[in-house]
């Protein structure tokens, strides 16, 4: 789902959690605040991407994507731009780059084909919605792992648009499955 809102609360973020939360295959990007603020409770986050959430309006490597004081964190197999170092997330998660061309830069489908879209790929003031499905070159592709979820209620077999996961192997990280891969698993040369 797409969510838009304004907040001046002290714990502002794209998603503010005050209780236990279990999230799988979420795409939380390009918000004018940290992506998640886990104020209290337990946060279980899997196969999700948090990138480009910034309080300054300019994406920078030091922008914190997850913040808060949750009582328990289980954050595995995600692609995250930055998080507090004391959370020690980098052994089980991918740390994304903000530098275009870097292998860990999360390339998304370019929405400039829409009328009124701009080259940043995020703002479409006169046209259709931005498309945040990963491109085939993105590190998010075939990087998901449903086996770590451990909860049948969170296990998914399709993305937010209905495309089946695991096209070409493992599912992609995030809410969208890349559609550039051949859905039947064979290559046709012409």
Descriptions of predicted regions:
Residues 1-137, 150, 182-183:
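Predominantly extracellular beta-rich ligand-binding scaffolds that present long acidic/polar faces
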Residues 181-190:
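Boundary/junction segments of secreted and surface-exposed precursor proteins
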Residues 126-173, 180-182:
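Active-site and glycan-interaction determinants of carbohydrate-active enzymes
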Residues 79, 175-177:
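Short, amphipathic alpha-helical segments that act as regulatory/interfacial helices
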